[in-house]
A protein has these predicted regions:
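Intrinsically disordered, low-complexity, compositionally biased regions/tails
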Residues: 7, 12, 199, 214-216
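N-terminal Sec-pathway targeting helices
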Residues: 1-22
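Ser/Thr/Pro/Gly-rich low-complexity linker/stalk segments immediately outside membranes or between
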Residues: 22-42
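Long, hydrophobic/aromatic-enriched structural stretches that serve as scaffold segments
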Residues: 97-104, 134-138, 142, 146
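Residue-level marker of positions within ordered structural domains that often coincide
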Residues: 20, 99, 103, 174
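Secondary-structure boundary elements
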Residues: 35-131
Length: 227
């Protein structure tokens, strides 16, 4: 009887695992992701808000018109963006162009040259995909070539023992006088409830305060959205 009881328990465990893996896979994944999200949000709340920045700097962005023209011609960006488009629409179009052509992967061979043209050539001759940092560098240069001020930012956790990170672009929107996060690697951007694009700092504040963040997918496929 004991043997049959153990066998019965094992069968139940196996059946449960199979159901979790093949039948309720999405539900289990959603539950685990939500649990992890709640845990991370609690850590953000414990960390508190950013200390007000009292330091200011005067600096100018260096412009390389020759390189910008080279990039625009190489990528035929006149077919991707138009001069009459608002800054944010241009930025989304460029991010969508990158996301459609280069998926995410942790490359096995690191490219020797990290500029827009050489990164593109890398995906056509060595590996077809690469990580978030290289995504951000490529998008950074495409945006700059169209006169769009932007930065690529490495997001680190506060935990010194956690080596994970993610790299995204911050785009300056002169029409709105604000920064906005754009992520061609994970194929998304973030908005508030009114449709205004959010910066990284604004996203952090909203997580802490419990306010809504609406994530928008860059591509049209249901499977491209991984936030």
């Amino acid at each position: 009887m004991v043997g049959w009881s153990i066998l019965g328990i094992l069968l139940i465990v196996v059946a449960t695992l199979l159901l979790a893996r093949f039948v309720f896979n999405k539900q289990v994944e959603a539950y685990l992701c939500n649990s992890l999200k709640n845990e991370m949000v609690e850590k953000l709340k414990d960390a508190g808000k950013y200390v007000p920045d009292t330091t200011s700097y005067n600096f100018a962005y260096q412009k390389d018109s020759v390189q910008s023209q080279k990039i625009r011609e190489y990528f035929k960006l006149d077919t991707v963006v138009y001069s009459t488009m608002p800054t944010w629409d241009k930025a989304i179009s460029l991010a969508r162009f990158v996301a459609e052509n280069i998926p995410h992967a942790n490359q096995k061979i690191n490219p020797k040259r990290r500029n827009a043209v050489d990164l593109w050539k890398y995906t056509r001759s060595i590996e077809p995909a690469f990580n978030c940092r290289l995504h951000s560098i490529l998008l950074h240069e495409l945006l700059l070539s169209e006169g769009i001020v932007n930065r690529f930012v490495t997001c680190h956790p506060a935990d010194s023992e956690d080596s994970d990170c993610h790299v995204v672009n911050l785009v300056w929107l002169p029409e709105l006088q604000k920064w906005a996060m754009l992520d061609s690697d994970m194929n998304a951007w973030a908005e508030d409830e009114k449709g205004t694009p959010l910066s990284l700092a604004e996203m952090r504040e909203r997580y802490i305060d419990g306010r809504e963040i609406v994530y928008r997918p860059l591509l049209n496929s249901e499977n491209d959205f991984v936030y």
